[in-house]
């Protein structure tokens, strides 16, 4: 099997700065990490490879410094890493990003073999749109399985895959054909510890680097800010909410009285909650 995992190097959310003119994230000088959701996707891909054989190619789009995240992915056990980097990609929204990544995945298929599965995290912590994975699937005409918690089985003979998809109030069990694209949920698979051999191999490995032309992109106007119709009107930090702690003396009060006092206090601050609970009780009756 050939599996492609799309990861993204994201800024530490606690130290994000926003450009005052373009309303894009300023990454210079901000510590970066691999998008946490992408690590769950990477671990699931590695588990599939370990069980069924094949190789895992990790792909990211970003500035040259994103090579650091790719080497980290190699230490976890990925077989190959490709960096899609070009000044033309700067300022890409989800539409332009999914276009560039889909073109690169098509090039990967031509160079290293068509992927059977493309994995992504469900979303990134810097954008939180959850649009790039489905956008890639649409452009590559792949079946998309989103918000997947677990890959339960793969039948290479029939080219079928079964997954568990987390849904409100339960779990969906879905069966699909390969190839497909899967977006992984958080908490599904904790990333493994890389071995010493993998760490040494990662340090020696060459990171494949493609610019827009090398990735097979012919229309540069679909990349970067020029290819991004999304307009961010305003970016701001929410006003911190005041938090208070209330201490209730229970020495001389019965527990039921304490509970009633707490409920009354909560409803006083959140009247909508009282109405919602009253409606729920009426329906249940």
UniProtKB/Swiss-Prot annotation:
PROSITE patterns: ETF_BETA. GO terms for biological process: nitrogen fixation. GO terms for molecular function: electron transfer activity. The keyword Electron transport applies. Keywords: Electron transport, Nitrogen fixation, Plasmid, Transport. It holds the Pfam family ETF. It comes from the Bacteria. FixA and FixB form a heterodimer. May play a role in a redox process involved in nitrogen fixation. Belongs to the ETF beta-subunit/FixA family. PANTHER family: ELECTRON TRANSFER FLAVOPROTEIN BETA-SUBUNIT, PROTEIN FIXA. This is Protein FixA. The gene is fixA.
């Amino acid at each position: 099997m050939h599996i492609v995992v799309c990861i993204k190097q994201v800024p530490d959310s606690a130290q994000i700065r926003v450009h005052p003119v373009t309303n894009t994230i300023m990454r210079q000088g901000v510590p970066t990490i691999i998008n946490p959701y992408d690590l769950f996707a990477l671990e699931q891909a590695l588990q599939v490879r370990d069980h069924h054989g094949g190789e895992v190619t990790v792909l990211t789009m970003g500035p040259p410094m994103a090579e650091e995240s790719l080497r980290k992915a190699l230490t976890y056990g990925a077989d190959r890493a490709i960096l899609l980097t070009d000044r033309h990609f700067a300022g890409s929204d989800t539409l332009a990003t999914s276009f560039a990544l889909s073109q690169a995945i098509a090039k990967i298929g031509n160079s290293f073999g068509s992927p059977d599965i493309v994995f992504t995290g469900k979303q990134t912590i810097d954008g939180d749109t959850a649009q790039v994975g489905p956008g890639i699937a649409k452009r590559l005409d792949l079946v998309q399985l989103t918000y997947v918690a677990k890959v339960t089985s793969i039948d290479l003979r029939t080219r079928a895959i079964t997954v568990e998809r987390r849904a409100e109030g339960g779990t969906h069990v879905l069966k699909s054909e390969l190839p497909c694209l899967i977006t992984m949920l958080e908490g599904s698979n904790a990333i493994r510890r890389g071995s010493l051999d993998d760490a040494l191999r990662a340090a020696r490995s060459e990171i494949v680097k493609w610019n827009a032309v090398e990735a097979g992109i012919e229309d540069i106007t679909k990349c970067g800010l020029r290819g991004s119709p999304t307009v961010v009107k305003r970016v701001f930090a929410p006003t911190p909410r005041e938090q208070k702690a209330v201490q209730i003396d229970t020495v001389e009060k019965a527990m039921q009285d304490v509970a009633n006092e707490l409920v009354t206090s909560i409803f006083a601050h959140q009247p909508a909650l009282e109405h919602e609970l009253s409606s729920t009780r009426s329906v249940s009756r």
